[in-house]
Amino acid sequence: MKYATGTDNAMTSGISGQTNNSNSASNEMQPTTSTPTAVHKEATSTATTTATYANGNPNPSANPSQSQPSNALFCEQVTTVTNLFEKWNDCERTVVMYALLKRLRYPSLKFLQYSIDSNLTQNLGTSQTNLSSVVIDINANNPVYLQNLLNAYKTFQPCDLLDAMSSSSSDKDSMPCYGSDFQITTSAQCDERKLYARKEDILHEVLNMLPLLKPGNEEAKLIYLTLIPVAVKDTMQQIVPTELVQQIFSYLLIHPAITSEDRRSLNIWLRHLEDHIQAAAAGLTNRSYFLQPSPQLVAGGSSTGSGSCSSSATSSSTASCSSVASSSLCPASGSRSSRTNDWQTIAPPSKQLQNKLAGDWRGSGGGSSSGSINPLCDNLNGITLNELASSQNSLGLSLEGSSSLVNGVVAGAGSMLGIGGGDDHDTSFSKNGTEILDFDPVTADMGEACSLASSSLCGRNGGNTVEDRSQPPPNLQQQLLQPPPYASILMGNVGDQFGEINRWSLDSKIAALKTRRSNSLTTQTISSCSSSSNSSVITVNDNCSNSTENLAQFANKPRSFSLSIEHQRGALMNSGSDTRLDEFKPNYIKFHTRNVGMSGIGLWLKSLRLHKYIELFKNMTYEEMLLITEDFLQSVGVTKGASHKLALCIDKLKERANILNRVEQELLTGQMELSTAVEELTNIVLTPMKPLESPGPPEENIGLRFLKVIDIVTNTLQQDPYAVQDDETLGVLMWILDRSIHNEAFMNHASQLKDLKFKLSKMKISMVPKMHHVKPAGVGPNNGNINKPRWNGKTRKCDTKSGSNDRINNRKNSNDMLNFSLNCLPHPLPHHSQQAPPPLPQFDYNGYGGGPSHQPQYKSSSYPSFMGNPQQQPPPPPSSKSHHHPQQMQQMLQQHNHFPALPQQTPPQSHRRSLNNLILVAGGPQQPQQLIFKPGQGVLTNNGSNDNLGLERNQQPQQQQQRKLSGGVSSAEQQPKKTMAAVVMENLAKFDQHFTLF
């Protein structure tokens, strides 16, 4: 039914279809209304008027310029809805109220709760049937009573009737039924109608008790679910009315006691029932109580887009499109009724079979059938699918693009029939080339409840009004009576291709349709409902009941990419690697489980290169894992090589206690090296272990023994002076500690392990690196200083072209003026001990050196020559005690003679580095000079140093004489022994007096 916003077309789309106004409808229903109902109607009328004045514009689509008051328009709408509500049965009213309650806010819901409690109290106090209501409430939750009722329903079958009629005995054998107050007797004189009526009475009683089922009563719920397959079978055999079974389905699909797994089991039976309803509506059966097409429904359905909401219009249009495509491609739909249905092969819904159901056929067939046959449920679908949120699951779905009830139609029939329902439907393509239905099961089931309730209403009213209405056009009637495409595809193709529907047996193994390799980390329950040439529709189910079902599912899983988490299709097609080990991350395969000691099973399998079999251990306990054998692994589909390797590794897990005990004893006695013990710990740290606090014998506590061995190894490294502290051993031990910190078995000891790891890290840092040799004290230019062992003059590059032994500076940010060469200092030369050192060159302020002009120069001015001509170097000063102070002063002045002088004419040259060009030296003597500044060159300043320079000139002849007198003394005794650090500090102290850097 389409809810209309105006009053003109409100009644044209109603159930009766007659042109009755609100007053006549109100008067028509008045005799059947009791006095309390009239009081409530009066109160409702007053509340309606008050709400109208409070709301200035109750109808946004109405024209503000209309003369009719807005309160009158709202009152008429309320009256219309009330009249329609009065014409519905109890199941339809319950479904509508359930759908409308989902659209209310919390204050309104609390108000209705208080009102309902008050109404229940008044009815129990004033009603004459309060005792019977209490009895029904008790029986509805009594498993014994319900089981007797179910046994009574199952007792009478058509075969029993034929046997009773063929018998010649005239005695009456009565069989009591404990589920109700009546007696069911089977005799030769009982006819078919009486048997059908008695079964129908049992279904009526179940229909009255089902709403009173309390959530949490699992035994009673299981009996209600067990009745469904038998009732559907009787409906197919035309024994009980279809509308009764539909109403039972409506209650079950919205009942808070029914879980999502129960709804999945119900959806299979619901598809068969809808297929039978469509076949009956098409005229294939001639039972009077089956669903018949109603002309007023066709008239109401023709005005779909006039006053309905957008979601309902979209739903009906998409469903009609699917019906047209289905009718054009499947004209011989009547042949489906001739197939044999072996209903006994499908087990009744139970907790053990909920995870093995063949597919998740939900939310599609009922929605499409209701949209094409009865437009009553279209608006109810819009109500339920807009803001529904039950206490069990969230039912909120957006109504963008297409209604959610036809998303299953688009998903199932889109690839086979070429129907597209929109770009934003709830069907997503997986990375393996198959389709995954990811719509909300509870929302779809809510739509099923709406369709079932409305269909039962049509079945009740269709026979009364069919004589007074003209038949719709043939093409429109054929379109409306076409079976739902989704159910026909899933059911018809199976019947046409495989013969009988017993191939849907839930007890047999579910065949896996292998398309492309799927992710082994994705738990999938794959069901095949069509041939391999068509696209399969699979549902992702992560709720596995036990490990046996996991193994059964694993046996049928296709070969998979081991660790591909999320990849695009192009990456999967172009990749040449099957294992994708480079993308492995530890958190990808670390799943949360309730089984103690099994959270790290993924890392252990990864270390064995068997991580693709992680699904075997998802819901397996620690004890069950240790009992796995090679034969068992091969029986569930593991390859021969992998099963053999995994079985050997599991056998090694049982030997861990003995290995750790042996390592502990040998470490205490000194018979085992630390490297061997660390290697044993490496093999055990990734294995699954129970926490230390787990109950059990101490000899089986692997975690406790593991910590004991770690404690012995670390104490030996820290305290034993004879222990070999190997850098590699320390690194492996720190890795073991890091793995242990994140292990489930040592979660309560993580802080202690972290402290131990920190101590080992400090020990590792304090160890001398292997690659650097420590020189003894007094040897080399550093005099045994190991603070900077890497930087010495021998390991640096030297200038081989100019014949100099100076180091070449290769740093980009180096400053040539700060790199003081050790050649400026007098060094001992054993092989030239009898020769006096050459004199140092004299500086000239004009840039002219004291030596010859052919002094070797670097190609770049950024590399000035720090080595003067050996013939121009002055001899070392004599080592006389009387001249100790003058010699020290002279030496300090001579330390600056190694700086280069400015050349006369230097052609422009290319420099490799530009940072040296930023160094400029300002100042100079007060006399006028003509200097050509080149990049990387410096000029001495006279900032208070003229006196020192003059003193240096005056002392030059004296130095010459002193060097001649001390020629016979060895050079080794004359040279002062200074370290490089002392020379650098002295140069830096005098640097500010001679240079100014910009």
UniProtKB/Swiss-Prot annotation:
Q: Where is this region: Interaction with cup?
A: 583-763
Does the keyword Repressor belong to this entry? yes
**Residues in domain SAM?**
600-654
Q: Where in the cell is it found?
A: Cytoplasm
- List, as start-end ranges, the regions of compositional bias called Polar residues: 1-37, 801-822, 854-864
Going by the UniProt record, its keywords in alphabetical order are: Cytoplasm, Developmental protein, Phosphoprotein, Repressor, RNA-binding, Translation regulation
A GO biological-process term: negative regulation of translation
Q: SMART domains from the xrefs?
A: SAM
* Alphabetical list of InterPro entries matching this protein: ARM-type_fold, PHAT_dom, PHAT_dom_sf, SAM, SAM/pointed_sf, SMAUG/VTS1_RNA-bind, Smaug_SAM
**Looking at the UniProt record for this protein, which Gene Ontology cellular component terms does it annotate, in alphabetical order?**
cytoplasm; P-body
The protein's predominant localisation is: cytoplasm
Q: Give the function comment from the record.
A: Translation regulator that binds to the 3'-UTR of specific mRNAs such as nanos (nos) and prevent their translation. Prevents translation of unlocalized nos in the bulk cytoplasm via the recruitment of cup.
Q: What is known of its domains?
A: The SAM domain mediates the association with the 3'-UTR of specific mRNAs.
Q: Describe its partners and assembly state.
A: Interacts with oskar (osk). Binds to the 3'-UTR of nos. Interacts with cup, which in turn recruits eIF4-E, leading to an indirect interaction between smg and eIF4-E that prevents mRNA translation.
Which PANTHER family is this protein grouped with?
PROTEIN SMAUG, STERILE ALPHA MOTIF DOMAIN CONTAINING PROTEIN 4-RELATED
UniProt similarity note: Belongs to the SMAUG family.
The protein depicted here goes by the name Protein Smaug
